[in-house]
């Protein structure tokens, strides 16, 4: 006996995504704003259409992606809200990140110093987010007392605006 199977597909309801955004917001303090994580093409559901459908929502602070390429794709498709790169960034991307006002993740003084210099060359400031490793052992500075001094050094660099800090729970 032969089985004929139809191809599987996911139909994404952009109105439902918008409704879900507000359902989450209703559980939070009214002043809390959300960052929508749309990395890996929105986990295969279409980062660009999802981002375009919700970018004007008041409760949305911005978007997060995994790579510089994903961030640039959002910018090239009209996304104007802040974009945070959750993964590593590389020196060849620094000028583009600064010009496009994309927020990189920082967890070493060396990277922060390079970003500060690149921003100075463009006469700009660059907002960054500090990544703390709480057990995933991928990227981030250790969650220990020694990292406090490192964070202070990063925050004191010219052109660097320490906008936030995050972790990925293990």
Residue positions per predicted region:
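Glycine-rich phosphate/diphosphate-binding loops that line cofactor/substrate pockets in enzymes
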Residues: 21-32
């Amino acid at each position: 006996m032969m089985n004929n199977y139809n191809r599987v597909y996911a139909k994404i309801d952009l109105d439902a995504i918008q409704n879900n955004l507000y359902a989450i917001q209703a559980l939070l303090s009214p002043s809390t704003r959300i960052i929508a994580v749309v990395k890996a093409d929105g986990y295969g559901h279409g980062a660009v259409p999802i981002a375009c459908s919700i970018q004007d929502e008041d409760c949305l602070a911005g978007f997060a992606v995994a790579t510089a390429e994903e961030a640039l794709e959002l910018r090239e498709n009209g996304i104007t809200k802040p974009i945070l790169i959750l993964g590593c960034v590389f020196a060849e991307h620094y000028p583009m990140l600064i010009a496009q006002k994309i927020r990189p993740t920082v967890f070493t003084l060396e990277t922060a110093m390079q970003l500060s210099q690149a921003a100075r060359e463009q006469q700009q400031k660059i907002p960054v987010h500090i990544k703390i490793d709480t057990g995933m052992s991928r990227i981030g500075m250790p969650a220990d007392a020694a990292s406090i001094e490192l964070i202070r050094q990063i925050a004191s660099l010219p052109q660097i605006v320490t906008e936030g800090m995050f972790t990925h729970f293990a």
